[in-house]
Swiss-Prot record:
The gene is rnhB. It comes from Carboxydothermus hydrogenoformans (strain ATCC BAA-161 / DSM 6008 / Z-2901). This is Ribonuclease HII. Manganese or magnesium. Binds 1 divalent metal ion per monomer in the absence of substrate. May bind a second metal ion after substrate binding. One of its GO terms (cellular component) is cytoplasm. One of its GO terms (biological process) is DNA replication, removal of RNA primer. Endonuclease that specifically degrades the RNA of RNA-DNA hybrids. It holds the Pfam family RNase_HII. Disulfide bonds: none annotated. It is an enzyme of class 3 (hydrolase). Belongs to the RNase HII family. The keyword Manganese applies. It is found in: Cytoplasm. GO terms for molecular function: manganese ion binding; RNA binding; RNA-DNA hybrid ribonuclease activity. InterPro entries: RNase_HII, RNase_HII/HIII, RNase_HII/HIII_dom, RNaseH-like_sf, RNaseH_sf.
Amino acid sequence: MQGKFDKIANITLVMKTLDNNLPFNLQIENQLFSSGYELVAGGDEAGRGPVAGPVVAAIVVIKPGIYIPEVDDSKKLSSKKREKLFEEIINLVTDWSVAVVGPDLIDRLNIYQATKFAFKAALDSLSIKPEALILDALKLTGFSGKQVSMVKADEISFAVACASILAKVIRDKIMEQYDKDFPGYGFKKNKGYLTREHREALELLGPSPIHRKSFEPIKSFYGQLKLFEKV
């Protein structure tokens, strides 16, 4: 229980020191800038929950003075708005990187470890290395700089919100291509999430090559298949 109270206390401390003259979602970055960190990164992912397709991690690096007022958590924006902001973000930020981890590695590692793997790959791909990194309720091993881990960071950090938009737009494009490669599952619409129509397609067609075998109901499908093969 003490750990939970410590986290609440830390978040409360951050909130108390916010500058009302700054945009709310730039407060954390500005605290880091004020502490001497000149290159601050935010990371976010898309695709942890779906039963099909990859998990995509994005990292965005910013310097003081970089800001786009319209940027928000990607889930709060329309597809059209995300795509518009995508172009603005990649043209304005100091550096950015995206890593894609497919279903096979997700099944091998588990989704949590696969997500961390994607973040590490994105971090390693950056041309400009950040001095501080903000993530949503996650910490990475091997990063020597300052790390800030906060729940719902995509709602209160500009850099993380930028990363959430990049990850979401790129993953959506991947799923739209998969909709053409594997028709019948509705990937363009459901993006791999288990909607009623998606479940019905699974019952009719069986899993596709991009379905995650470690996720239900696909896991049970392959379990039943093994039992059938033994009979």
